A protein has these predicted regions:
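N-terminal signal peptide c-region/cleavage motif recognized by signal peptidases
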Residues: 13-16
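Short amphipathic, basic-aromatic surface patches that mediate peripheral association
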Residues: 27-37, 164-179
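Short coil-to-beta strand junction motifs in C2/discoidin
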Residues: 37-44, 99, 176-186
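Surface-exposed loop/edge segments in extracytoplasmic proteins
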Residues: 51-58, 191-201, 236-237
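Aromatic sugar-binding surface patches on proteins
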Residues: 66-90, 205-213
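Surface-exposed, short loops/turns at beta-strand junctions within beta-sandwich domains
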Residues: 95-98, 216-222
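Short acidic/polar inter-strand loop motif in beta-rich domains
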Residues: 96-117, 230-239
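Short, compositionally biased P/S/T/A/G/V-rich stretches that sit at domain boundaries
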Residues: 124-168
Length: 247
C-alpha cells in the first residue's frame, strides 16, 4: 500500500468517525385537530439533505391520535407539550458529521388518497442535539368521502349527494361538537366543464360526520358532481368529485 492510498484511507476513516447519529422524531398534526396516525393510514415522512438532495430517511407515522383533552381542551402555557407516548410518530436515526440543513416533507393521510395534503418545513440537524418532542408539521384540510354516488341520471332528475366529513386525523364532525360543523360551509354542485349547472346546501343527516343534499340535474352530457367543505375559522378545506353521465 503506497503512502497516498494510506493517507486517503485514514482521511476517510476520520470523516466517518466524526459522524454521529442524531435521533429525529416527526409528528404530523391535523390542523385544528389531533395527530395523523395508524387509524388513517399514517402520514408519509421524507427527510432530505437540502444541499445535496439526498434522502436521509423516510417512513410513515404510526401510533394513536393523542390525548384529546391535552390537545383540544386544556389551556396551555407557552412551551407546554401536547405530545404523549401514544401519539403517532415517525422515528429516524440520521448520521451527520456537521450541522446539516434538511427539508421534512409530510403527506397524508395515506388511507384516503382523494383527501391527501402535503406540507414541508426546513430544519437544521445539529450533531449531539436532539429535539425533545421532535418536529411537528401541521396538515391542513378535511377528509371527505362521497357515499353511494350515482354514475348515471336523466335531465330533470334530482341527484341525492351524501358525504362523510372528518378531520385529517379521523376525528368526527357534527353541529355543536368539538369539531363544530355549524361553522362549516358544505355544498354540493353539478358542473359541465367550467360551468356550474346547479348547487345545493349539504345538511347534517343526524349521523356523526354525515351530510347530504339534493342537486337538480339541469343539463345533459358528461357532468361532474362536486362537494366542497370550508371552515373559514381554521382555513380547512376539502373537495371531492365524481363523474355523472346524464341522458
Amino acid at each position: 500500500m503506497n503512502k497516498l492510498t494510506l493517507l486517503l484511507l485514514l482521511s476517510l476513516a476520520a470523516s466517518v468517525s466524526l459522524a454521529e447519529p442524531v435521533d429525529v422524531k416527526v409528528r404530523v398534526l391535523a390542523n385544528d385537530a389531533k395527530f395523523v396516525g395508524t387509524s388513517m393510514g399514517g402520514a408519509k415522512v421524507v427527510i432530505t439533505d437540502v444541499e445535496s438532495g439526498v434522502v436521509l430517511a423516510s417512513g410513515v407515522t404510526k401510533g394513536g391520535t393523542g390525548d384529546t383533552g391535552l390537545i383540544m381542551r386544556k389551556p396551555r402555557e407557552h412551551g407546554q407539550s401536547i405530545v404523549t407516548d401514544s401519539a403517532a410518530v415517525f422515528n429516524a436515526s440520521i448520521d451527520i458529521g456537521r450541522p446539516t440543513r434538511v427539508r421534512v416533507d409530510a403527506s397524508g393521510p395515506l388511507g384516503y388518497p382523494d383527501s391527501t395534503a402535503q406540507v414541508s418545513a426546513t430544519h437544521w440537524l445539529i450533531p449531539g442535539h436532539e429535539i425533545t418532542d421532535g418536529w411537528t408539521l401541521v396538515l391542513p384540510g378535511f377528509v371527505i368521502e362521497l357515499i353511494d354516488a350515482p354514475r348515471k341520471s336523466s335531465r330533470g332528475d334530482e341527484i341525492p349527494l351524501q358525504v362523510k366529513l372528518v378531520m385529517m386525523c379521523g376525528c368526527p364532525t357534527q353541529p355543536g361538537g368539538l369539531w363544530d360543523s355549524d361553522q362549516y360551509t358544505i355544498k354540493g354542485q353539478l358542473w359541465k366543464g367550467d360551468t356550474m349547472i346547479s348547487e345545493a346546501d349539504m345538511e347534517y343527516t343526524g349521523k356523526t360526520s354525515h351530510y347530504r343534499g339534493v342537486v337538480p340535474v339541469a343539463a345533459s352530457g358528461e357532468l361532474e358532481m362536486l362537494v366542497y367543505a370550508v371552515d373559514t375559522e381554521t382555513g380547512n378545506t376539502a373537495v371531492i368529485t365524481s363523474p355523472l353521465l346524464v341522458r
